[in-house]
Regions:
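Surface-exposed, low-hydrophobicity beta-strand/loop segments enriched in small/polar/acidic residues
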Residues: 1-130
């Protein structure tokens, strides 16, 4: 996978969720909630699940992983620009976009952009801030 988050300020809030044993997920992957207390790698306009805080190796017997719920991370913009101060949400595999009103209602906002960026740019995001 590409475009994993780069942690700038260490998170202080974490959660533990269930993951599939037969899945490999790189460290710092943006995760989505896919079911009750279950996460998988983000793939679209998904409900925020956190930043994977530990690498998950395929078929290693581990079915629970820790995710960071806050902190400051460098994240990659999807096909559209992100404006300074805007709330952002998932937009694909390890990609973000500007959140719209419906994203707020559905729990998809992941944080606030602390810098602006165009498509494909890396921007700093304060995860957990609204």
């Amino acid at each position: 996978m590409a475009n994993e988050a780069v942690t700038i300020e260490t998170p202080t809030e974490f959660a533990v969720y269930t993951v599939a044993d037969g899945t490999a997920i790189p460290l710092n992957t943006l995760m989505k909630l896919s079911g009750d207390f279950t996460i998988i790698a983000s793939s679209g306009k998904d409900v925020w699940g956190g930043v994977l805080w530990e690498e998950k190796t395929i078929s290693d017997g581990i079915t629970r992983c820790t995710v960071a719920l806050n902190g400051v991370h460098d994240l990659t913009c999807a096909a559209s620009a992100v404006t300074l101060g805007s709330q952002v949400c998932l937009s694909g595999a390890n990609l973000i976009r500007v959140a719209i009103a419906a994203d707020l209602l559905l729990g998809k906002v992941i944080g606030k952009a602390e810098e602006a960026g165009s498509a494909g740019d890396i921007v700093r995001v304060r995860v957990g801030a609204t």
